[in-house]
Design a protein with these regions (language model features):
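Phosphate-group recognition and catalysis centered on beta-loop-alpha active-site segments
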Residues: 1-225
Length: 225
């Protein structure tokens, strides 16, 4: 029987502050196949795990992340006393424990992310994901074997065609856009299909019925197989 991969969204954001080491460790504890985190750059070029363009929602600070230094970010509380981790810290925690999915949120992150992964000698499967498909192209140009996931919100045909130029191995789709026919069409192109962010039992069952290969969830303990 086909096994659907379990991916912890922002670690396991249903259990601990998103994108923190606590959330990541919880995802690993819950047995995920992959931990997914978001990657952004600070003003001084450091890669950190953060979803939004500002720190307002997820920390006790304010301001755009691209105007804050790493030192500024390290002083912030990301919830429950957790800090915003650097990518290097994430790589150390996940290496050898689970796979890692890095969602690149900004232009210019791709090359730095590849260098950080190589420097860390990360052990385990790794997927680079992005809605910024040109960033995936940068990674493909330096690593022909990298696993790349082209993320989509809606699916205009032109956007799909542009993304395919970068030879992704995976596509990431909104759970409410997925149908069996769509999944089969991507499978016919030798692409694996993951869905996000799939939290309710009904959403999970629908994704499985559509034939997806991976489910990204804030509550991965609901992925019971």
């Amino acid at each position: 029987m086909r096994r659907v991969l379990k991916i912890g969204h922002r670690g396991a954001a249903g259990h601990a502050p998103e994108n923190t080491l606590a959330a990541i460790r919880k995802g690993i504890e819950l047995g995920v196949d992959f931990v997914e985190i978001d990657v952004r750059c600070t003003a001084d070029g450091s890669l950190i795990a953060l979803h939004d363009a500002t720190v307002n929602r997820t920390t006790d600070g304010k301001g755009p992340i691209d105007r804050l230094s790493l030192l500024d970010v390290k002083a912030l509380d990301a919830g429950n006393g957790e800090r915003v981790p650097m990518l290097e810290e994430v790589l150390r925690v996940v290496s050898g424990q689970a796979g890692l999915m890095l969602e690149l949120k900004v232009k210019g992150a791709a090359q730095k992310a590849v260098e950080a992964v190589q420097k860390a000698e990360f052990k385990g499967p790794l997927i680079y994901a992005s809605f910024l498909h040109e960033e995936l192209g940068i990674i493909r140009s330096v690593d022909a074997e990298a696993s790349l996931m082209a993320l989509f919100g809606r699916l205009p045909q032109a956007s799909v065609a542009r993304a395919m130029k970068y030879s992704p191995s995976h596509v990431g789709l909104r759970h409410d856009t997925v149908t069996r026919r769509l999944v089969e069409a991507f499978h016919d192109e030798d692409l694996l299909v993951f869905v996000y962010t799939t939290d309710t039992i009904r959403e999970i069952q629908r994704a499985i019925s559509a034939g997806v290969d991976g489910i990204i969830s804030n509550v991965p303990e609901r992925l019971r197989w």
